[in-house]
From Swiss-Prot:
Region spans: Disordered: 184-203, 256-329
GO MF assignments: zinc ion binding
Gene that this sequence comes from: ZNF843
Domain of life where this protein originates: Eukaryota
Entry-linked PROSITE patterns: ZINC_FINGER_C2H2_1, ZINC_FINGER_C2H2_2
Compositionally biased region (Polar residues): 184-195
InterPro entries, per database record: Znf_C2H2_sf (IPR036236), Znf_C2H2_type (IPR013087)
The organism of origin for this protein: Homo sapiens (Human)
Name of the protein described by the UniProt record: Zinc finger protein 843
Zinc finger extent (C2H2-type): 33-55, 145-167
Key words of the record: Metal-binding, Repeat, Zinc, Zinc-finger
SUPFAM superfamilies: beta-beta-alpha zinc fingers
């Protein structure tokens, strides 16, 4: 391959744009692409551009792999990258290429100061570094003065009586030695008889609670008997006196009627109206006759009882079978009878 003239090499070009006029590969051992900063020559312009990054940005220099660290060998001490940590001078190849002293910023003291200024680290990593004490603001202040009633703490003694409002039924703390008194009987200290207790005494905060939490609870009121056991008295009649909690007074049934009641229970269940009347008679207080019922109530009792019995029979009836043509399992309902008859006629 024909070689290019020497006048077209990168030496005649400005150092700010180190490029080569040709991108071909030279096989005669010449290195026409030279770096103006360090004087190293390369056979390709791509290698020169990659090498120029060493002089332009020191951040990319720190991220170079060990294979490409040979690009840093021809660097001079005064042309070292402006790195505050000086990591580019830690490789063995770079130390071999340096013949003089290192730059002034590579000294131990200057490196430590620059590293602490740029990226602060915890104490003990670079040595005993004294950190400035944080400013004493309201969030970091110590509040040594505590109220013996509510437990709130303040930073000044005067604020204890100015900012903290006095609690109901209690006296404010004066000078840290004045006692406080509460309306609750359980808050009185066992040692004193007047109910006064010095601030900061053991158990003063736990025992000095608001009166609402220390008052005894009211006795539990048991509810009355259920409505089903209370006598049914119309609004026109006088009120029946309350039945005591010890038990219900059951009206005494005459001995002549007891055999009849036993015979009636042995014969079978009675109607709902008669059962309800008997239960009212049993719960009825002595001395009051059974309230008279209107004629309309007697008339409504019959249809309601029949409807209730009809609903019970329908609930007890078995579900319809899967085969509607099986007449033996069909219940007595006219709708299902009609449907079965139609299906039988259709089949025949």
């Amino acid at each position: 391959m024909r070689s290019l003239p020497f006048a077209l090499t990168v030496e005649s070009v400005s150092a700010r744009a180190p490029t080569c006029c040709s991108t071909g590969r030279f096989t005669q051992g010449r290195q026409p692409c030279k770096c103006k900063a360090c004087g190293r020559g390369f056979t390709q312009s791509a290698s020169l551009l990659q090498h120029w990054r060493v002089h332009s940005d020191w951040r990319e220099t720190l991220s170079l792999s060990p294979v490409r660290q040979d690009l840093l060998w021809p660097l001079q001490p005064h042309q070292a990258p402006a790195s505050p940590l000086g990591r580019s001078h830690s490789s063995a190849g770079v130390r071999q290429g340096f013949s003089g002293q290192l730059c002034c910023w590579l000294t131990k003291e200057h490196t430590l100061a620059e590293a602490l200024r740029l990226s602060p680290v915890p104490a003990g990593f670079w040595g005993p570094v004294e950190a400035d004490r944080p400013p004493a603001n309201s969030h970091r202040r110590v509040c040594p003065f505590c109220c013996c009633s509510c437990g709130d703490s303040v930073n000044e003694k005067t604020s204890l009586s100015q900012r903290v409002l006095p609690h109901p039924g209690e006296k404010t703390c004066r000078g840290g030695s004045v006692e406080s008194v509460s309306l609750a009987p359980s808050s009185v200290a066992p040692d004193s008889t007047s109910g006064l207790r010095p601030c900061g005494s053991p158990g003063s905060f736990l025992q000095h609670l608001p009166p609402s939490t220390l008052l005894p609870r009211p006795p539990f009121l048991y509810p009355g008997p259920p409505l089903s056991l209370q006598p049914l008295v119309p609004s026109g009649l006088p009120a029946v006196p309350a039945v005591p909690l010890g038990g219900l007074e059951v009206a005494q049934v005459p001995p002549a009627t007891q055999p009849a009641a036993q015979q009636e229970g042995a014969m079978g269940p009675r109607s709902c109206a008669s059962a309800g009347r008997d239960s009212r008679e049993a719960v009825q207080a002595p001395g009051y006759p059974e309230p008279a019922r209107k004629a309309s109530q007697h008339r409504a009792a019959g249809p309601l009882g029949e409807a209730r019995a009809r609903l019970q029979r329908q609930c007890r009836a078995p579900p319809p079978p899967s085969n509607p043509h099986w007449r033996g399992a069909l219940p007595v309902f006219p709708v299902w009878k009609a449907s079965s008859r139609r299906s039988n006629l259709a089949r025949h």
